[in-house]
Regions:
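Transmembrane alpha-helices and adjacent helix-loop boundaries
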Residues: 1-237
């Protein structure tokens, strides 16, 4: 597959002390969101968004050993279709449907990539990312003349939790200043990150996670034990 020998893959450590680390990380994030100024809030919210996208690489690259350079484009399709076609749906139904759309695009990319890996797979996924950008994001038929779509803020219980609603108070709490982004938008992002991280941890602990690791270690050996290698790769994408 492009090389004479393959180096040994790094050992996949089984998650431990998940609950204490989750609580510690959440508390530290809340301290930054509520206790620091808007620069820190913006940086933390950007970090939380990046974590959600990076978790897909944890599964795809870390568990299955498949190199993908299309994850940002796939995530972009979710946001694009959410803002254009599902913006009227209540939160969190809209983002969930957007995630399913991203899963469909991930599957479309995975099918031609089933028989390659390594650098060749990276080239294929990079080409797919460029194709998605040109056919969807830069297509005025879909994205409009400006190439940008407005996304309505999430509403929970009739309250605007969007990043610009700095006057929002929940339990009498708000940020230390009135400069966007809204601190409670960051809290929503934190909750989503915690849920997604726990889901990835459970995948690692499950039978599916063990199948992923077997495919990463040796595809032929995994197939010999009855694992459907193609299905495992598509599921990871």
């Amino acid at each position: 597959r492009g090389s004479v020998t393959l180096g040994r893959m790094p050992f996949a450590v089984k998650p431990q002390k998940v609950l204490p680390l989750t609580i510690l990380g959440s508390v530290a994030t809340l301290v930054i969101l509520f206790g620091f100024n808007y620069d820190w809030r913006q940086s933390m919210i950007n970090t939380l968004v990046a974590i959600v996208i990076s978790l897909s690489l944890v599964v795809l690259v870390g568990f299955v050993g498949q190199i993908s350079l299309a994850q940002m484009a796939i995530a972009g399709t979710a946001g694009f279709f959410l803002s254009k076609y599902f913006s009227d749906l209540p939160f969190p139904l809209g983002p969930i449907i957007g995630a399913f759309v991203a899963a469909v695009f991930g599957t479309l990319i995975a099918v031609p990539a089933l028989r390659v890996r390594g650098v060749n797979l990276a080239v294929i996924t990079l080409s797919a990312a460029v194709a998605i950008e040109q056919l969807i994001f830069r297509n005025k038929t879909f994205a409009g003349e400006s190439g940008a779509l407005k996304v309505p803020p999430p509403e929970i219980g009739g309250k605007d939790f969007g990043p610009n609603n700095t006057n929002l108070k929940v339990l009498g709490l708000k940020a230390k200043d009135d400069i966007p982004p809204n601190v409670w938008f960051g809290v929503v992002c934190l909750i989503i990150v915690v849920i997604m991280c726990l889901m990835v941890v459970n995948v690692r602990r499950s039978a599916t996670g063990r199948q992923f690791l077997a495919v990463r270690s040796n595809e032929r050996a995994a197939a010999a034990t009855g694992i459907n290698v193609a299905s495992a790769k598509v599921l990871a994408f």
